[in-house]
């Protein structure tokens, strides 16, 4: 599980850290792991972020500070979670009581959700407001949780809500269906991520750019917990660092591999080969490939002579011809902000030596994005 805000580094205009993670996940983890995005953002702001940044498609999305859980591309809501959060929750009472605090400034309408009421509050007033508000709401018969994060955001949720509780709910659900993950890595950077690290048997990483309130929580509650680390890398790079630190699996992104030409049939992995192919394609068009003839030869070696590349338009072309056609576009994006990444790489073996691989390919050239399925 990772917070989709923490993986996005707004100080990295080319999104290289995020693209490194994308390549690692799609080449090594997509087919046998679950990618969960957990964010304080509402569905509206989350979808806006996905339009701005090269983010992968998660298997599960947790939004609005753990009050909304959805599944898959269609973001199907978890109705069981909704029913659970309705207990001892009355949004009208919350709105009535918070209106009595002039220190609170209501956030935009998009951030107000069925089980989340969100405000801005000055840092020096936050603790006093939270204490007084909690007392008022308890006196009104509500059981709520008040979360302060980002040095200004104050969210009021049902007591059973939150990123940590949402994760615990999912793990319980997986266990009941005998699908409990072998390992779970929770990643965070703000105060509303703290409870993620309180879930038993979960590995945790605070990225190097974690905010003050999360660092304070760590110092007070988990400083000597070996399952929780403070990474030295920012954002998505910190997640990669944690995967390596806890030995959870491969932690070298294909984007960190200089020579992509080495393809050994005994270690053949179709997902890894697809990721490598489009990394090569990016470098090829940016004129960053040396010894390209050797790479093309190795690429053909792992492709069956009868292999077919099916374009999203439906046009079929032999894999070898598709590889040869690369020669016509070498260096046409040299010096430009051109990046390529793949999403939802899903291989299926259809014969003893045959694979069908479906994926989405994205390209960014300057500010323009395009995709092929």
Task: Write out the residue ranges for each language-model feature.
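Asp-based phosphoryl-transfer active-site loop
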Residues: 1-14, 197
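Active-site phosphate-binding/coordination module
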Residues: 15-111, 209
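Exposed beta-sheet edge and beta->alpha loop/turn motif
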Residues: 349-373
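Short structured motifs
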Residues: 102-103, 340-345, 358, 368
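A solvent-exposed, acidic/Ser-Thr-rich amphipathic alpha-helical stretch
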Residues: 290-353
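Short, low-complexity N-terminal intrinsically disordered segments enriched in polar/charged residues
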Residues: 257-302
């Amino acid at each position: 599980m990772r917070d989709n805000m923490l993986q996005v580094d707004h100080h990295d205009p080319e999104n290289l850290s995020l693209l490194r993670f994308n390549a690692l996940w799609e080449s090594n983890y997509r087919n046998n792991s679950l990618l969960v995005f957990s964010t304080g953002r509402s569905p509206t702001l989350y979808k806006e972020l996905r339009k701005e940044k090269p983010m992968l498609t998660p298997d599960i999305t947790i939004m609005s500070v753990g009050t909304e859980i959805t599944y898959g591309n269609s973001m199907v809501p978890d109705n069981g979670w909704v029913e659970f959060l309705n207990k001892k929750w009355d949004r009208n009472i919350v709105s009535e009581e918070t209106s009595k605090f002039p220190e609170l400034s209501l956030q935009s309408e998009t951030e107000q959700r069925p089980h989340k009421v969100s405000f801005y509050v000055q840092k020096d007033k936050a603790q006093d407001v939270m204490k007084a508000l909690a007392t008022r709401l308890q006196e009104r018969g509500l059981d709520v949780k008040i979360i302060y994060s980002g040095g200004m955001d104050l969210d009021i949720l049902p007591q059973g809500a939150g990123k940590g509780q949402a994760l615990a709910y999912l793990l319980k659900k997986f266990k009941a269906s005998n699908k409990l993950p072998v390992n779970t890595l929770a990643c965070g950077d703000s105060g509303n991520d703290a409870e993620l690290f309180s879930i038993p048997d979960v590995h945790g990483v605070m990225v190097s750019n974690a905010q003050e309130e999360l660092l304070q929580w760590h110092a007070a509650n988990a400083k000597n917990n070996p399952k929780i680390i403070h990474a030295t890398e920012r954002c998505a790079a910190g997640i990669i660092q944690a995967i390596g630190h806890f030995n959870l699996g491969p932690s070298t992104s294909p984007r960190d591999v200089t020579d992509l030409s080495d393809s050994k049939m005994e270690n053949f992995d179709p997902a890894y080969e697809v990721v490598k192919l489009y990394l090569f394609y990016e470098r090829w068009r940016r004129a960053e490939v040396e010894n390209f003839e050797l790479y093309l030869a190795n690429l053909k070696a792992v492709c069956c002579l009868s292999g077919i590349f099916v374009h999203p338009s439906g046009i079929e072309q032999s894999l070898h011809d598709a590889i040869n056609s690369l020669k016509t576009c070498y260096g046409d994006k040299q010096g430009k902000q051109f990046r390529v990444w793949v999403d939802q790489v899903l291989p299926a073996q259809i014969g003893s030596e045959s694979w069908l691989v479906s994926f989405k390919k994205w390209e960014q050239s300057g500010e323009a994005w395009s995709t092929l399925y």
